[in-house]
Regions:
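Ribokinase/PfkB-type carbohydrate-kinase core domain
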Residues: 1-7, 70-72, 98-158
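Short beta-strand scaffold segments in enzyme catalytic cores
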Residues: 43, 91-95
Length: 158
């Protein structure tokens, strides 16, 4: 690994944003984007010139491929991303609102590859090579095993 400035981890999902305002049930066209709080931070930091690593699990599916392609395009180290043949990459649907109100978001993430993140996914020393570990409450909230991983990472950075 090159020396990383920041390591973060979490769940990435494919996000489909309705092309027109209105209820999701009536939406006929969507634009595919990437979603995930921790990944958004990683992308922003990489665009600012920081060397960023991101840890996660994605499914061996089209959405997982989309996440990996996005990481490569954004220059984010994905050497600690596990491709899981058993569980899918999550996705979400998001309404489009032109009136400034909050959009409706429907998540399809239960049983996702990222919800199976655990200490077994961690490559020893990965965060020690970074200057900063970025954690939020989102990734630890998706499963008990992901929460254990968050505490393991934080302890390693002490």
């Amino acid at each position: 690994h090159q020396q990383l400035d920041v390591v973060t981890y979490g769940e990435a999902m494919a996000m489909f944003v309705a092309a027109e305002p209105g209820p999701l049930a009536q939406a006929g066209q969507f634009t595919k984007r990437i979603a995930g709080a921790d990944l958004n931070v990683a992308i922003g930091l990489s665009r600012l010139g920081f060397r960023v690593g991101w840890m996660s699990r994605v499914g061996r599916d089209s959405f997982g491929g989309y996440v990996l392609d996005t990481l490569a395009l954004e220059g984010i180290d994905a050497s600690c991303v596990t491709v899981d043949p058993r569980y899918p990459t999550g996705f979400q649907l998001k309404s489009r609102n032109d009136d400034g109100s909050d959009p409706v978001v429907e998540y399809f993430r239960k049983g996702s590859a990222a919800s199976h993140l655990s200490c077994a996914d961690y490559v020893a020393g990965y965060v020690l090579g970074a200057r900063h570990l970025h954690l939020t409450g989102v990734a630890p909230a998706i499963s008990a095993s992901s929460c254990e991983l968050a505490f393991h990472l934080a302890r390693e950075m002490e």
